[in-house]
Amino acid sequence: VTIRFTPEATIELEDVLGYLAAHSPGGARNVSARIQQVLSNLSEYPLTGMRTSLEPMRRVAVTPYPYLIFYLPGDDEIIVVGIRHAARDPSSMPDQP
């Protein structure tokens, strides 16, 4: 299963890592590595994440960090539609593309 980012998700990831890098370069590296681990797990087990009210969208936590990855699972492809800090207003979470 391949993983593809929407343009919005790419911007969100760059924003998260850019913010972290400005305040803690080591923290940015750790969060980036953990996001990659979570995405690797999703490529093997695409239904791992929790269902959302916007089915078929799912979300998975980037533990121990406070980030959520929102994605659409598919047979051959996972589409990442958003990466958000868990404390953000729920109404700002992504819709389906």
Stretches with model-predicted labels:
Residues 47, 62, 85:
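Short, conserved catalytic or interaction motifs in soluble domains
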Residues 54, 64-65:
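Structural motif corresponding to alpha-helix initiation and N-cap regions
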Residues 57-59, 68-69:
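Short hydrophobic/aromatic beta-strand element in the GNAT-like acyltransferase core
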